[in-house]
Amino acid sequence: MHHPGRDQERLYLQVSDEFGGALERLARAYERDSDVRRDLLQEIHVALWRSLARFDGRCSMRTWVYRVAHNIATSRVIRAKKSATAFAELALLESIPDKTDGEAQLDRRRTLDRVYELIHELRPIDRQIILLYLEDLDTPAIAEITGLTARNVATKIHRIKQLLARQFHDKGC
């Protein structure tokens, strides 16, 4: 006997296990406040659960998960926009030192925090693109998720990297 609910639950558990870390990083990049971040992550998981019943395999599961997560996060940003905060036009960090001693770990943590702050200042579409890029999605996959052309995505990635690197160095990071 076929049980769609069990299949959906099994699929959700698999997706949650495989992409949970990426979803947490995405939520962290969108929300600074830990309570708001937890709410966003929960909202993403609920949306994923609901959406899996409609998943038809026309795209990869990875693309589906990122599309759902980014749509939820972007919608939330738009809804939560209360002030006319100026978003940075574009911005990337080329490398983060990978040291093992305690002081180096603290420096790395501070560097990552600063990178997340810079990413958070980006316009939602630019933030979405760079986060997908940092999750190692290729240009065609990012284009499919965002609805932009692959060429436009490639151009934006290049500009975002330049902007982030410039801001990172200009602000003494």
Predicted regions and their residues:
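Arg/Lys-rich amphipathic alpha helix in sigma70-family domain 2
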Residues: 56, 67-88, 104-108
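Amphipathic alpha-helical segment used for protein-protein interaction
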Residues: 98-130, 135-140, 144
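C-terminal edge and immediately downstream basic/flexible tail or linker adjoining helix-turn-helix-like DNA-binding
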Residues: 2-6, 10-12, 85-87, 91-94, ...
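Structural recognition of an alpha-helix C-terminal capping motif at a helix-to-coil junction
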Residues: 39-46, 50, 59-71
